[in-house]
Amino acid sequence: MKKEERHKVLAIPVTFTEDKPKFLTVRDRRFKEWLFISGGCRKREVLNPIRCALRELEEETRGVVNVKSGLYTSYTFETTDRSPEELEEDRKEGVHVTIVYHVFIFFMKISAHEQQDIVRKFNYEKAKVELRKKDKLPIKRTYDENDFMSFDTLDIFNRKNRWDLIVNKVINNPDFYSALNSLNRKSFNIR
């Protein structure tokens, strides 16, 4: 069996409201699970996964969150966990897949009012897509992966139905808290 490595990202915008971290979270339309922004890297993005994270952040927020510069911390983890459908596909292709996840925590200053405005814009964009679907017009499928967006504390996020990978590899991972609390932040400026 051939071994294959694929690269994915988790983009986790965080803002501190009243000294408590609030995370931008979305709910996956298909599986009804809450998660951080996630997606696969294109071949040209593998060597610079922050570009992938920023692209996914824009796509999965329906174009509402488009970040070009700021501060971040990051870490990586690997997993061979795959869905039953993916495992069946891997078996047919004769590959054993390892996924390398690049986790980026983006530190942002977003007031409570701005958070509400971002969610409102997301809902407006969602309504526009629903109208286009109803009228049988083309839509950007990448902008239609998530049906809800929220800024949540971890306490609130942990009460929701979450994707197992987020729980096991992020929320329960000490590397996440090290990155979140690190003052050794890197800057980025993508044009």
Regions picked out by a protein language model, each given a short descriptive name:
Residues K20-N66:
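Conserved Nudix-box catalytic region and its N-terminal flanking loop in Nudix hydrolases
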Residues E4-R6, E18, F36, H96-V100, ...:
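A generic fold-level signal
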Residues H7-A11, P49, D147:
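Residue-level detector of short, conserved catalytic/binding motifs and their immediate flanks
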Residues M1-F23, R42, H102:
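Conserved N-terminal beta-strand and adjoining loop/helix that marks the start
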Residues H7, T76-K134, F148-D155, K169:
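Active-site-adjacent beta-strand/loop module that shapes the phosphate/pyrophosphate-binding cleft
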Residues K32-E33, I37-G39, K43, R82-T98, ...:
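Functional cleft and adjacent loop/helix regions within the main domain
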Residues R30-W34, E114-R191:
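Nudix hydrolase/Nudix homology domain
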